[in-house]
Amino acid sequence: MDYIKRFTTREGVRMSLAVTTDTVETARVRHDLWPVATAALGRAMTGAILLAGDFKNHENVSLRIKGDGPLGVVHVDAFSDNTVRGYVDEPHVDVPLKHAGKLDVGAAVGHNGEVQVTRFTQLAQDYTSTSPIQSGEVAEDLAYYLYASEQVPSTISLGVLVDPDYHTVVAGGFIVQALPDATDEALAQVEKNINELGPVTEYLKVHPDGKGLMERVLDGLTVNEVYNEPVNFQCRCGRDRFAGALMTLREDDKKAILEDETTELVCHYCNEKYHFSREELQDMFEPKGPVQ
């Protein structure tokens, strides 16, 4: 089962860790993603889940990665209940592999563009901030965003492994952040641990449940687990929402769609299809008099 865990340490370092294999696979199936699209969207979904709740507040986060690569825009919404949804503009993209047969997410996303993050919090006004894309590999781009926009030094590792049949083998990642009281010794120790760990997907291949990953990253520090909750793909769409959207159409547009026997609407985020018959729409669009 997918999850997110958060840890604090006595030495002033904190860590958020997520395993998202099933969540990413759900997105792959719903959107019929090709491998590099799965990797890009999976990294972005994992990163957004890690961003969606800090250690004090849980909030909704909207992440848009707008690169100049063939994938188009990567769209992700992560919610305070640890659910996430997302899509890419072009799910059927193929780019040449990098060395050792690695997926070239940077080429698919693009090396130029911007990362846009909107935080929806109950404690303050919603706000949006942007930062330039650094590599298109997602993790480096989010780390730069946190430093440039929120002044939080962070190390982020995100990974998605896809097999030759396009299925998601493992997916997950972590964020490690230094608090103002972090000691130089602790930061040096964590940097050493992360360098020795290598790519997070290599670890998850051996330990798909992520067990022991925190111990590897925070080895040598005094750790306290403060949060442990499940993660899953879930959309906020629904038939009632689409019906409400149809009601906002101009009269000319309403007449136009009534020319068809059935109207199909598709949610971008989850690819769910909603069908409305002509009779349903006629009833919906018919002016309703005041209740007597």
Protein language model regions, located:
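Interaction interfaces in information-processing and related assembly proteins
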Residues: 1-227
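Cys/His-clustered metal-coordination modules, chiefly Zn-binding fingers
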Residues: 195-292
